[in-house]
């Protein structure tokens, strides 16, 4: 099929839809379905194919800049991606050690080869987002960087054709019979992946994406500044992967039998864990750097605002302090029962007023309610104690008319008065006993006189 050479020989296309399906075997029809996008002069047939096929992508005029944009950051390294040496890849690329053309799959048609390359590369071929070695000097002179709008798909087509030729050569070299068929398949796929790693130098310049120079390999954690979190989640995952594997080899696509590739779920879980660890480390590094942020602006122009401290709303609780030196105004004005009712009403009013200014947080509300209830009960207890002192003072003859008597004097005088009353009580009890005995004696003497007279 001459699909890719036709695309190269055309005028610079208006755009190339990113979701063209390569699963159809008839590639001429696929090219015809996208042909109106390469000839923008035919305005009468520009939207004709969109009404006929449901797989037709949206027109360039709807959202044209989404078709030109590249990924803001390169994806993860291909060694961490699933499906490179998975059973699905082995099923797509059957290999025969004999190299014949029978049902063993020794030779591939052009459509099968395109399907295999499309499944391996996925969306990275169309999106032009291959992983490159940052220490390589050739990727800076890439044609995709020179003109990322028009020469992207032609470069991808050229890369696919070169990789197909290298893959066929590697397959012919390894065509000797082996005892195990699966081992030959894995070795062939590893050779093809090494070719991909060699060609990965033709990728996007990371200096366009990252504001930091990539040749500084002394501190890989310097990219994990708080400014790097403003780019995209993929950059965070890339930084976290570089931090977690500082001893990674320069060939990231060399597969070994002792280390099987991780599955998609495992890689996603590891990526989430590494992202969480990276977020924690960024927050820890951000804390000591808050002093220097105010003095010098950040390099990328994006900086997170520091978290504002938690503001707790406090409600003013009115406390009435009693002046013990002042005369009690409620002692003679109201009786005791009426004073208790007034105090209870006052307590309920204070509780209802204090509940209106409570904090919206549940924990703060509970603490404030407990504190308020404790204060109200304590105030009520003090009032009851004060009234008890006033009642005790009224019972002491010496302090009955002294309204400014302190509590200590009241207690001392009350103790002395109680002791004196107890002594007088004992004295009266002894006198009562003497009088009872005297009565018994007189009564007995009266009986004797009556008997003598009779």
Curated annotation (Swiss-Prot):
Keyword DNA-binding carried by entry: yes
Industrial and biotechnological uses noted in the record: POU5F1/OCT4, SOX2, MYC/c-Myc and KLF4 are the four Yamanaka factors. When combined, these factors are sufficient to reprogram differentiated cells to an embryonic-like state designated iPS (induced pluripotent stem) cells. iPS cells exhibit the morphology and growth properties of ES cells and express ES cell marker genes.
Gene Ontology molecular-function annotations: DNA binding; DNA-binding transcription factor activity, RNA polymerase II-specific; E-box binding; protein dimerization activity; protein-containing complex binding; RNA polymerase II cis-regulatory region sequence-specific DNA binding
UniProt motif (UBR5-degron) ranges: 370-379
Sequence positions bearing N6-acetyllysine: 158, 163, 172, 290, 332, 338, 386
Keywords noted in UniProt: Acetylation, Activator, Chromosome, Cytoplasm, DNA-binding, Glycoprotein, Isopeptide bond, Nucleus, Phosphoprotein, Proto-oncogene, Transcription, Transcription regulation, Ubl conjugation
Entry superkingdom: Eukaryota
Covalent cross-link Glycyl lysine isopeptide (Lys-Gly) (interchain with G-Cter in SUMO2), where: 67, 158, 163, 313
Disulfide bonds: none
Modification Phosphothreonine occurs at: 23, 73, 330
Motif 9aaTAD, residue numbers: 115-123
Residue ranges of domain bHLH in the record: 369-421
PTM entry text: Phosphorylated by PRKDC. Phosphorylation at Ser-344 by PIM2 leads to the stabilization of MYC. Phosphorylation at Ser-77 by CDK2 prevents Ras-induced senescence. Phosphorylated at Ser-77 by DYRK2; this primes the protein for subsequent phosphorylation by GSK3B at Thr-73. Phosphorylation at Thr-73 and Ser-77 by GSK3 is required for ubiquitination and degradation by the proteasome. Dephosphorylation at multiple sites by the PNUTS-PP1 complex promotes MYC stability by preventing ubiquitination by the SCF(FBXW7) complex.
GO cellular component, one term: nucleoplasm
Database matches in CDD domains: bHLHzip_c-Myc
Renumbered residue ranges of the record's region Disordered: 216-310, 349-380
The keyword Cytoplasm is annotated on this UniProt entry: yes
Subcellular location: Nucleus, Nucleoplasm; Nucleus, Nucleolus; Nucleus; Cytoplasm
Residue ranges of the region described as Leucine-zipper: 428-449
Record field: compositional bias (Acidic residues): 266-278
GO biological process, one term: positive regulation of cell population proliferation
Function per UniProt: Transcription factor that binds DNA in a non-specific manner, yet also specifically recognizes the core sequence 5'-CAC[GA]TG-3'. Activates the transcription of growth-related genes. Binds to the VEGFA promoter, promoting VEGFA production and subsequent sprouting angiogenesis. Regulator of somatic reprogramming, controls self-renewal of embryonic stem cells. Functions with TAF6L to activate target gene expression through RNA polymerase II pause release.
Free-text note regarding domains: The 9aaTAD motif is a transactivation domain present in a large number of yeast and animal transcription factors.
Protein name stated in the entry: Myc proto-oncogene protein
Organism: Macaca mulatta (Rhesus macaque)
Name of encoding gene: MYC
